[in-house]
């Protein structure tokens, strides 16, 4: 990209685009940004030089917490689900918040009107080089995106996860965590009858506190959810977390809530140590265990010793 800038701001060539398309985000290499990790001194120095500014370096370092992008089979499955629910592509207004390099934009049906939002300027520039001919890429924080509520027919993507509370007086009055905020704002930006199709941390559905789910349920019905196994994103983004694909449909004004129950949690049907606290899972999965792509189990997780996971039982691409 530096070469493109230095040569008059030209677009990337097809060969350069092929290289850029392999980008999986800063989240896959957090150790390069860790000044205490001496194994990557050379790589750290080279990357600082390539980013060309302290601001660019700081911005990239901040996104290592949540810049995890999505493999092609999962993206294609999500678009397939949207199309099965009536998204035909012709003039459909689509938003991808936290778009990264544009994985979902790249697989969008022909004829869709696409907008991507990406905080990291380097990654947004990659998306622009890859998909600028067919999409509008906004290099800004999702909190700063100013569009009318109901502006989109479909919001699709992989929402970021981090223990931060975005400041947005309009769309985060409940002071929800980042992943839930993305979903709540996405629902606001979706027209009545439109869809939000998103990958999110399992904590959206499994958190004991139902406040975020209640706020979502005040606007939308759950169409369905699929829980992916651990390591579903290890190959493409370097992260090893359990995530859900959730599909929400924005209710028209005055419509009664419908669809499956999903606001409460219950005891997960797994064996645990006698002294361990019970692990909880969303009531949707207790009623629909076939929507868990693997076996529920207890493991040592990213944030605690005793955490719910899903061990794979087959080839995710085939499931």
Residue spans of the language-model regions?
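Surface-exposed cleft-lining segments at the edges of enzyme active sites
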Residues: 65, 169-173
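S-adenosyl-L-methionine
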Residues: 125-146
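Flexible, glycine-/basic-rich loop-and-beta segments that form/coincide
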Residues: 235-319
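Conserved Class I SAM-dependent methyltransferase catalytic core
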Residues: 119-121, 174-234, 241, 245-247
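Short, surface-exposed basic-aromatic patches at helix termini and helix-loop junctions that form
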Residues: 108-111, 128-132, 155, 188, ...
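Conserved proline-anchored active-site loop of SAM-dependent methyltransferases
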Residues: 9, 75-85, 89-110, 116, ...
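Class I S-adenosyl-L-methionine
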Residues: 1-130
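General small-molecule cofactor/ligand-binding pocket signal
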Residues: 115, 136-138, 226
């Amino acid at each position: 990209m530096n070469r493109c800038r230095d040569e008059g701001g030209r677009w990337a060539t097809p060969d350069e685009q092929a290289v850029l398309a392999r980008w999986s985000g800063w989240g896959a290499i957090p150790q390069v940004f860790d000044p205490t990790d001496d194994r990557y001194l050379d790589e750290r120095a080279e990357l600082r030089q390539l980013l060309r500014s302290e601001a660019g370096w700081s911005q990239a370092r901040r996104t290592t917490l949540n810049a995890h992008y999505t493999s092609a089979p999962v993206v294609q499955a999500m678009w397939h689900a949207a199309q099965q629910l009536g998204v035909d592509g012709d003039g459909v207004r689509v938003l991808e918040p936290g778009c990264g390099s544009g994985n979902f934009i790249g697989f969008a049906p022909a004829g869709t009107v696409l907008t991507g939002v990406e905080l990291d300027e380097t990654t947004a520039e990659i998306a622009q080089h890859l998909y600028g001919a067919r999409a509008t890429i906004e290099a800004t924080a999702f909190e700063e995106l100013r569009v009318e509520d109901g502006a989109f027919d479909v919001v699709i993507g992989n929402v970021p996860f981090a223990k931060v509370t975005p400041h947005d007086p309009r769309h985060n009055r409940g002071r929800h965590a980042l992943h839930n905020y993305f979903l709540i704002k996405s629902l606001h930006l979706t027209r009545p009858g439109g869809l939000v199709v998103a990958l999110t941390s399992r904590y959206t559905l499994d958190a004991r506190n139902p406040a975020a789910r209640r706020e979502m349920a005040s606007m939308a019905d759950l169409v369905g959810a699929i829980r992916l196994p651990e390591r579903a994103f290890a190959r493409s983004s370097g992260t090893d977390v359990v995530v859900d694909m959730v599909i929400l449909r924005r209710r028209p004004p005055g419509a009664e809530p419908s669809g499956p129950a999903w606001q409460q949690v219950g005891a997960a049907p797994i064996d645990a140590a006698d002294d361990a606290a019970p692990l909880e899972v969303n009531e949707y999965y207790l009623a629909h265990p076939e929507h868990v792509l693997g076996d529920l189990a207890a493991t040592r997780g990213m944030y605690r010793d005793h955490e719910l996971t899903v061990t794979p039982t087959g080839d995710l691409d085939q499931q």
